[in-house]
Amino acid sequence: MAKLSCSYFLVLILVFSAFLMVERAEGKRCHLTIDKATACSLSDCRLSCYSGYNGVGKCFDDPKVAGPSNCGCIYNC
């Protein structure tokens, strides 16, 4: 019976450590506005975000910044 309980305990520890490793691997997401001065071109935005930050670029309207739509880059911090 003691060997069986020890085996269950070992399996439980392994499963728990696997969950902890998955949480650390996900990371946090960061957002950065690229080139606020010019209007956003979706293809240029995606290319600069991917090449500079290995992220995904999207055009969006920012109420804090006057003018045309901006390029936003979402990437893993």
Swiss-Prot record:
Cysteines paired by S-S bonds: C30-C77, C40-C59, C45-C71, C49-C73
UniProt protein name: Defensin-like protein 159
Homology family: Belongs to the DEFL family.
Transmembrane helix found in the keyword field: no
Keywords, in A-Z order: Antimicrobial, Disulfide bond, Fungicide, Plant defense, Secreted, Signal
Transmembrane segment boundaries: none
PANTHER family: DEFENSIN-LIKE PROTEIN 159-RELATED, DEFENSIN-LIKE PROTEIN 184-RELATED
A Gene Ontology term for the protein's cellular component: extracellular region
Protein localization: Secreted
Main location group: secreted
Signal peptide: 1-27
Pfam families: SLR1-BP
Biological process, per Gene Ontology: defense response to fungus; killing of cells of another organism
Native organism: Arabidopsis thaliana (Mouse-ear cress)
InterPro entries from the UniProt entry: DEFL
